[in-house]
Amino acid sequence: TLSHAKSKADFQKGVSLIAAPRLNVMYGDAKGNVAWWATGKLYKHSPGVNPNFILNGASGKDDIKEYLDFSKNPSAVNPTWNYVYSANNQPEAIDGFLYPGYYLPEDRAKRITQLLKPKSNWDKAAVGKMIFDNTSSVAPEVVKNLISNVDQTSLSENEKKALTILKDWKGSNNLNDVAPTIYNKWIFNYLKNTFEDELGAENFKQFLGTHIVKQL
């Protein structure tokens, strides 16, 4: 259906037929229409059921309560902000409900909107520059929070120099940037000192490979 769609409505119908896997599908046509749909057959459990844990398959109490109509799937069709994007980030709530999923942190999505929002005259060169952008809009905010909890009177000269570098950092990750190295080492040591003693070395190593750790 998607391959033979002749209109936005045809394409949307094709997307609605995808029960699994859950995908972010982008659409654009020569008429200026843009759209984004999240695919997948979504469902609801009874209140109190947490699908992140092992459920009771015998009682029926933990079974799926209902499957939702495709109209309840997260989407944006010709939005007022005139563009669509996805960085596999958490969509906004629908009917007051945030759909669970293995989403990525907001870093890329936040940077994408930061670049797209103020500009409307995009061309090939501008898009190419955005594709290779390596700036985090989240990391500098994290740095502010970290520094606010540091007793700077007890720091060595080298540590004070590191803080100065971080304070001046705008979030870029260029080849010769020193700040990203300091930042990532600080984050690693923070996580290590917080979690490794509870998780153990092996589980902590596994924990570092998940997206959960990026959202702390």
Annotate each PLM feature.
Residues 29-216:
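Long, compositionally biased non-active-site segments enriched in small/hydrophobic residues and glycine
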Residues 18-20, 68-69:
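Short solvent-exposed loop/turn micro-motifs enriched in small/polar/acidic residues
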Residues 2-19:
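Alpha/propeptide regions of enzymes that mature by internal proteolysis
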Residues 21-27:
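Bilobed periplasmic-binding protein-like "clamshell/Venus-flytrap" ligand-binding domains
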